[in-house]
Structure formats: structure tokens, C-alpha cells
Design a protein with these regions (language model features):
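Short beta-strand and adjacent tight-turn residues that come in two discontinuous sequence segments
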Residues: 19-26, 100, 111-116
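Secondary-structure junction motif
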Residues: 63-93, 168-170
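Short, hydrophobic alpha-helical packing/hinge segments within bilobed ligand-binding/sensory domains
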Residues: 9-13, 19, 98-109
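Central regulatory/effector-binding core of bacterial HTH transcription factors
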Residues: 1-29
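Beta-alpha-beta core module
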Residues: 31-39, 43-44, 96, 104-152
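Short beta-strand-to-loop elements that line the ligand-binding cleft
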Residues: 1-6, 73, 91-103
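C-terminal effector-binding regulatory domain of bacterial HTH transcription factors
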Residues: 82, 133-134, 138-178
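Flexible hinge/capping segments at coil-to-helix
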Residues: 36-71, 151
């Protein structure tokens, strides 16, 4: 097991051959660094309500329902291709999106969105799963031309991640078919 402080370090380690692969959410930075992304599963966005009235739904909700509330992203919304597209679509539908947690301090109803990979085994009585565009693609990142052993390992991971998703993430995730 190799430890990296951030995605930049992971990219460097992949390019230098210090590591063979990494499990990540798809982002533009992967291709920009000359790395390859192999999708495995669709990973949904989890919404964590703050100071919301009891009628704010829990469980699975569509984007059209979620845009009625103030949003904030747990990280930078541009961290993944999916969150960038989600940000643009929510803005198009006139969602109120804030860039920080100040609304929580003022006790205004807000929903914090975070990729499910960062919120394992969500309790759907307390949070919601955003149903929009299947979710972000989660998969395996390698250098552009991995060796045959790594390629076979990637194929096995692509097959196993959907089967193990409920055990790993607390919810059944849909495989990415390509």
C-alpha cells in the first residue's frame, strides 16, 4: 500500500511507476496528466441536510426536487466531471448554490453534496441520494499504457467492484458498461 497526500502526488507516482493503479472519481485532471481512466461503477452524490424542515425528502430524490433547496458542495464542485456538469445543470434550473458553509452558521436550510465514496454506508433516513445522470464514474486510473499484468488486474477490478459495491459503499452501484 502506497500513501499519497493528494491527486497530484498520485498522478506523479503513477507516471513514475511507483504505483500501478489508483481508485478514483473521473476528473479532467486524469487525462490532462497523460493517465488512463477505466470506469467501473456509477457513484451517486449524497445530500446531507442542514437546518432543513422535516418535509425535505430523504432516500432517493431527483434533481428537480433537490434544486428547491440551497446547495453547497463538500469540496470544489469542479473536482469531478460529473459535479461540474451537475453544477451547470443545477444553475440552469436556478438552484441557489453557495460556495461555503456560511449558511449553516446562519441556520438557513441547506443541502451539502458529497460523492458517496466519501460518505460510506449512508443512512437513507438521514440523507438523500441524488438521482441524476446515474452519478459520477468511479474507476481505476493507470499510466497511459499499463503492462499486461496491470491490465488484467484492472479488468478483474472492473468486474468485481459492482459486485462488492454494497459491501464497500453500503449501496448497490450500477456498473459502467462500455
Amino acid at each position: 500500500m502506497y500513501s499519497c497526500a493528494n491527486r497530484k502526488d498520485i498522478g506523479r507516482a503513477l507516471l513514475n511507476g511507483e504505483i500501478d493503479l489508483s481508485l478514483q472519481i473521473e476528473c479532467a485532471e486524469i487525462a490532462a496528466r497523460g493517465l488512463h481512466f477505466y470506469p467501473a461503477v456509477y457513484m451517486p452524490e449524497i445530500g446531507i441536510p442542514f437546518h432543513t424542515p422535516p418535509e425535505v425528502p430523504r432516500g432517493h430524490i431527483p434533481l428537480e426536487q433537490a434544486v428547491k433547496y440551497r446547495w453547497m458542495f463538500a469540496g470544489t464542485p469542479e473536482q469531478s466531471l460529473y459535479e461540474t456538469a451537475l453544477l451547470h445543470e443545477a444553475s440552469r434550473q436556478r438552484a441557489e448554490i453557495i460556495r461555503g458553509v456560511k449558511s449553516v452558521q446562519y441556520k438557513l436550510p441547506s443541502l451539502m453534496l458529497t460523492p458517496a465514496v466519501y460518505y460510506r454506508r449512508p443512512n437513507l433516513e438521514q440523507v438523500f441520494v441524488l438521482d441524476w445522470n446515474k452519478g459520477m464514474r468511479f474507476g481505476i486510473v493507470t499510466k497511459a499504457e499499463p503492462d499486461p499484468v496491470v491490465e488484467e488486474y484492472v479488468r478483474q477490478l472492473q468486474h468485481l467492484l459492482p459486485l462488492l459495491s454494497e459491501k464497500l459503499f453500503g449501496m448497490k452501484l450500477e456498473p459502467v458498461e462500455e
